[in-house]
């Protein structure tokens, strides 16, 4: 049962009961990346308390949008994952990500970020319709913590790659530099000057931003929430 109920006969009211609690949407974001242990969720959701996380997970299980799975050895761990009903919320959450871009602002020094969130960004902001036929490989972050993303454009738009064929462009960089290249707000020479490694065809690299549809408000029209402000 929901913690609260809107006395309104409306499917949006029911959706708000499922998603409206603080942290609920972000828990689903984490499970869109893949199944997660409780400890993984606690680490990735910086700022959530153990008790609140437990309550939110229990509520989402009650709604049938997530469940638990026991992984066999050698993992031998219990993980949370999206159910079919939870997976059906993916396009809704990606649309919310596009909506939230208006208030994102620049990356703050104290903001937590997981490199594999970028895969969700690629899904959320992929251009509709045909895009240049190019193959890209991104290594986001450094060392063993780097996240590898492979995707290509084409007649049907952006799609992720599972093959081992070489990419036209390979980028290795920290998240903020990769974001700058994806959006076209950072020139390749400026990214290299800040430590990015970029290999491959310069013409293909120039087509990278055209794989996406990023729309930015002017700073005067879209201000991010103050740090510590309640959503």
Kindly give the residue locations of the regions a language model identified.
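N-terminal intrinsically disordered/low-complexity leader segments
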Residues: 1-8
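A short, structured beta-strand/loop element
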Residues: 148-170
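C-terminal interaction segments
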Residues: 164-231
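Basic amphipathic alpha-helical segments that dock to polyanions
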Residues: 53-63
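Basic, amphipathic "hinge/linker" alpha-helix immediately C-terminal to the N-terminal HTH DNA-binding motif
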Residues: 20, 72-96
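N-terminal helix-turn-helix DNA-binding core of bacterial DNA-binding proteins
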Residues: 10-49
């Amino acid at each position: 049962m929901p913690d609260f109920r809107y006395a309104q006969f409306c499917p949006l009211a029911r959706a708000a009961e499922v998603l409206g609690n603080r942290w609920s949407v972000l828990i689903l974001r984490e499970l869109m990346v893949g199944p997660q242990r409780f400890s993984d969720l606690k680490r990735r959701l910086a700022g959530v308390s153990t008790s609140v996380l437990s309550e939110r997970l229990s509520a989402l299980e009650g709604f049938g949008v997530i469940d638990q799975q026991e992984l066999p050895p050698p993992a031998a761990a219990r993980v949370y994952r999206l159910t079919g009903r939870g997976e059906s919320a993916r396009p809704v959450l990606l649309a919310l990500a596009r909506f939230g871009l208006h208030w994102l602002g620049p990356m703050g020094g104290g903001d937590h970020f997981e490199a594999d969130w970028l895969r969700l960004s690629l899904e959320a902001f992929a251009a509709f319709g045909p895009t240049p036929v190019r193959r890209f490989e991104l290594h986001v972050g450094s060392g063993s913590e780097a996240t590898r993303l492979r995707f290509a454009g084409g007649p049907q738009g952006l799609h992720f790659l599972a093959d081992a064929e070489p990419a036209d462009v390979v980028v290795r960089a920290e998240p903020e530099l990769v974001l700058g290249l994806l959006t076209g707000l950072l020139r390749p020479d400026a990214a290299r000057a800040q430590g990015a490694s970029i290999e491959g065809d310069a013409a293909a690299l120039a087509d990278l931003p055209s794989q996406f549809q990023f729309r930015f408000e002017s700073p005067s029209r879209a201000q991010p929430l103050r740090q510590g402000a309640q959503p």
